[in-house]
Amino acid sequence: MDDRPPPHPEPSASDSDSDSSSENPLASISPSEIRVAIFCALPIESVAVRYTLDEEYQCRPPRHHPQSKYVFTYGRIGEHKVVLARPHQIGPVKAALCAAAVSGLFPTVRFALMVGIGAGIPGKRDIRLGDLAVGVPRENHPGVVEYDLGKYEKDGFVLKGALNKPHPVLVSADGALEEEEIMGRRPLRRVLRELMRRPGYGRPDLADVLYDPGFHHVNKGEDCRACDVADDSKVVARPVRAGKRGYPVVHRGLILSGRGVIKNPEDLDRLRRGQDDAICFEMEAAGIVDEIPCLVIRGICDYADTHKQDGWHRYAAAVAAAYCKAVLCKIDGPEELEDPVKQRTGDAFGEDLRLDADWCRRPHLE
């Protein structure tokens, strides 16, 4: 399966305007009403997020602004008006340019979420395809680190430099969702079920196989059918998961972000050595988190190896989009800012956002 969007392509801004004006015009909002930015790198990711919007809007940011070359989607999730942005290309540099554009065009944006697919890092944690990786800060890391800035030493890979942490209210909302999980509830159930009805976004009927790191993909450029006939010694044995089959498990920890795609098992082993909390590789977050406080959410679509797992891409994107909505619906809508400059000063804007105590009574997320 390729990375093209579903059969109904994502409409351009001009298409949306023409269709909506003749049939069902979109309501208009001001750029100053937008408080949340959502970033996606691939069309399949942004389409998954659009499917979770409770409402779409029209919005006209200043055309004279030097960063107005991007086309955005505007909508509402829960009580939050959001701008959905997609860089022109993948990678941290393009992501940073897009984040800077969002900051310039929408100065009232308080925080962001990076939503999409990523490569799981199997090891001490039982990470499976279709699971979730969330970059949550710990005492020894901010939730996301840029592995391009580190260096290899004899004891493993040593990370250098530091990136900003996600906004505290996003971390608190994630913690509230973790409490729901511990209590045996499934906060993603309804949203994910609705997403899985969309063309191409259902859970694939494919085996989730973790191959031995030393076993390279057979027949480059093709799927893993030739790999599947290998003897059992090439496959990592894993127990059947308890609980509801197929429901994603959320893994919280360190996300490694960089410019290159990790496929070499030796590089993977060196990077994760000494980084016990590392759960996922991805390529854009490092360009965003220093521009806007950002929570990184990735659906696991492969294991950072040479084996092709393209059939999991859209489902992994759907899982990430569902979790993004769950996080935002945990947070009350922000009050109007008296001084927009305060939003860039860390804790200054934490006072305007409160966790929603009525989470369990939200019917659309039961």
Named regions from a protein language model:
Residues 2-352:
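Intrinsic-disorder/coil detector with helix-boundary
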